[in-house]
Regions:
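Conserved beta-strand segments of alpha/beta enzyme cores
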Residues: 176, 197-198, 283
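A short acidic, Gly/Pro-enriched loop at the edge of an enzyme's catalytic core
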Residues: 208-218
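A short SAM/SAH-binding and catalytic strip from SAM-dependent methyltransferases
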Residues: 218-225
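Repeat-associated, polar segments at repeat-unit boundaries in modular proteins
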Residues: 2-20
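Conserved Class I SAM-dependent methyltransferase catalytic core
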Residues: 180-184, 238-283
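Conserved SAM-binding strand-loop segment of SAM-dependent methyltransferases
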Residues: 196-204
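Class I S-adenosyl-L-methionine
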Residues: 32-193
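Short glycine-enriched, charge-decorated loop/helix-capping segments at active-site entrances
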Residues: 231-236
């Protein structure tokens, strides 16, 4: 369910008296804004396929990304089609097993294609990097449309390659897109796919985004028995999925919407503390 941020009138008046906090400046580039293209996802079957097919698509995207970076240029619309088929390494742990004879060639190719840092991050993501099906994202945007949202500042704090951006409805295309992605390889692909978006490649806990700014914070947040080190929230001892809710509520403006996919760990856990925290700050 969407969560609407609410505040007392005195707090709103105080905000209006303060100077507006600006977002970090966009990265400087010689590429003209008119030459930039945001990819549009039109295939609901994106990400569907067997393990070997996903591997081949991933490798094609990685090799193209490295080529683009060597040539210091942005992807063309045709090249964005190739990049869009990157689905990460969730469910592909066999590609990292040097003792798996059925994947011996794939292991060699993968190991040779990635830097040590990229390889380590990819291997660590095999249990966590699962992408959101288009049908789910479309349903979330339908709900957002029914709430009356048409355009504004949208933040996706765990954006992956940017499927939430790629499925943005036509009616919301005038929105300003902001993404955060902790994985370098995935974030770099997202930057090539959504060239007009402002995407930061770092953990959500390290982002310097203004409070009370975004109209919508949307996405599929990470989950697990992991605590994020963020001094602003450490006292609450939030697990990672709950932390994303807490920080998102501070980033969204009063009257804005937080709309997340999360595990049952947020709404069904025995302790009510996280639910109390959310209820005190939103409706």
């Amino acid at each position: 369910f969407p969560i609407n941020r609410v505040e007392k009138i005195g707090y709103i008046q105080k905000l209006l008296e303060q100077e507006k906090t600006e977002l970090p400046p966009e990265e400087k580039t010689e590429t003209l804004a008119t030459d930039r293209h945001n990819f549009r996802i039109t295939d609901d079957a994106i990400g569907i396929g067997g393990a070997k097919e996903k591997f081949r698509n991933n490798m094609a995207a990685i090799n193209l990304l490295h080529e683009l970076e060597i040539e210091n240029r942005l992807a063309t619309p045709e090249e964005q089609e190739v990049l869009s088929r990157y689905v990460g390494w969730g469910g592909l742990s066999m590609a990292f097993d040097e003792h798996n004879a059925a994947w011996a060639e794939e292991f060699k190719e993968l190991y040779a294609s990635l830097s040590p840092e990229e390889y380590r991050a990819a291997m660590e993501s095999t249990l966590t990097a699962f992408y959101t099906p288009p049908v789910v994202i479309k349903a979330m945007y339908d709900a957002l449309d029914r709430l009356g949202f048409s355009q504004g500042n949208i933040l996706e704090p765990s954006c992956g390659t940017g499927n939430f951006f790629g499925l943005l409805p036509e009616s919301m295309q005038n929105s300003k897109l902001h993404g955060v992605e902790i994985d370098s390889l995935t974030g770099r692909i997202a930057k090539q796919l959504y060239q007009k978006a402002n995407i930061a490649i770092e953990g959500f806990e390290k982002t310097n985004l203004p409070d009370d700014h975004f109209d919508v914070v949307i996405g599929n947040v990470p989950f697990g028995e992991i605590r994020v080190n963020d001094s602003r929230y450490n006292a609450q001892k939030f697990l990672i999925h709950d932390y994303f809710f807490a920080k998102a509520l501070d980033k969204v403006r009063a009257g804005g919407v937080v709309m997340f996919i999360t595990s049952k760990g947020t709404m069904d856990k025995a302790s009510p503390e996280v639910r109390k925290y959310i209820a005190q700050r939103a409706e």
